[in-house]
């Protein structure tokens, strides 16, 4: 797998989970002899929602909610077969979305 790059993008609502997962991926890749760039924190996506408190009147009275999606980006340069096997066996927390691209 020479001259290839694995790009890993992590998404989660909890920044502690995403940082822990990123650390596990970096440790696993470095143990197998690959070069890792990152984790690079990407901008946090914030979705805001306004809901009326009352079902009938009082339009001025609203509840405000938000969802924050944290993101990290990592590149693994020149991965070996051992690196790919170790990454596939890695067990990450349930709240982390992992997107992997081979380039």
UniProtKB/Swiss-Prot annotation:
Which regions form coiled coils?
Answer: none
Does the entry annotate any disulfide bonds, and if so which pairs? none
* MF GO annotations: structural constituent of ribosome; tRNA binding
| One GO CC term, this protein | ribonucleoprotein complex
One of this protein's GO BP terms? Answer: translation
Query: Keywords assigned by UniProt?
Result: Ribonucleoprotein, Ribosomal protein
The keyword Transmembrane belongs to this UniProt entry's keyword annotation: no
Its biological function? Involved in the binding of tRNA to the ribosomes.
Q: Which family does it belong to?
A: Belongs to the universal ribosomal protein uS10 family.
* Subunit-level organization: Part of the 30S ribosomal subunit.
Q: Which PANTHER family match?
A: 30S RIBOSOMAL PROTEIN S10 FAMILY MEMBER
The record's annotation in HAMAP family points to: Ribosomal_uS10 (MF_00508)
What protein name does the entry list? Answer: Small ribosomal subunit protein uS10
Q: Which organism is it from?
A: Aromatoleum aromaticum (strain DSM 19018 / LMG 30748 / EbN1) (Azoarcus sp. (strain EbN1))
Starting at the broadest rank, the lineage of the source organism is:
Bacteria, Pseudomonadati, Pseudomonadota, Betaproteobacteria, Rhodocyclales
